[in-house]
Design a protein with these regions (language model features):
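A general secondary-structure signal for short beta-strands and their flanking turns/coil
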Residues: 1-3, 39, 50-52
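Short S/T/G/P-rich N-terminal loop/turn motif that feeds into the first structured element of a domain
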Residues: 1-33, 47, 62, 84-90
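Short, flexible active-site loop motifs that bind/organize anionic cofactors or intermediates
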Residues: 8, 55, 69
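Short amphipathic alpha-helical patches
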Residues: 29, 52, 77-79, 88-89
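A short linear hydrophobic-aromatic micro-motif
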Residues: 38-44, 78
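Amphipathic, hydrophobic secondary-structure cores in small proteins
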Residues: 42-57, 65
Length: 90
């Protein structure tokens, strides 16, 4: 399944708000999968110095990732398909 990143700018976000957004995203992904639209939140990284977040999703399409984030009320700047590379792959 393709891997996507949802890039976000989250000025002033608190740790509690980040956790709440994660709970909503996880719930919405599970609901969409149950409805037949496979989307799974893999992990997120928050960059405090730039107030940016990169959230990774396995999904059938970019639109599925956008819909999951919209349902979860988690804003995003853009969703981009990525190619994963790990040290074990090289």
């Amino acid at each position: 399944m393709p891997l996507f990143v949802a890039k976000r700018t989250l000025p002033g976000i608190t740790p509690a708000a980040l956790m709440s957004a994660g709970v909503r995203a996880k719930t919405c992904c599970a609901e969409m999968t149950q409805e037949g639209e496979s989307v799974r939140w893999v992990r997120s990284f928050f960059l405090p110095s730039t107030e940016q977040s990169h959230c990774y999703f396995d999904a059938a399409s970019k639109l599925a990732v956008e819909e999951a984030n919209q349902r979860a009320r988690v804003p995003f700047d853009e969703v981009i398909e990525v190619i994963e590379m790990t040290p074990d792959m090289v």
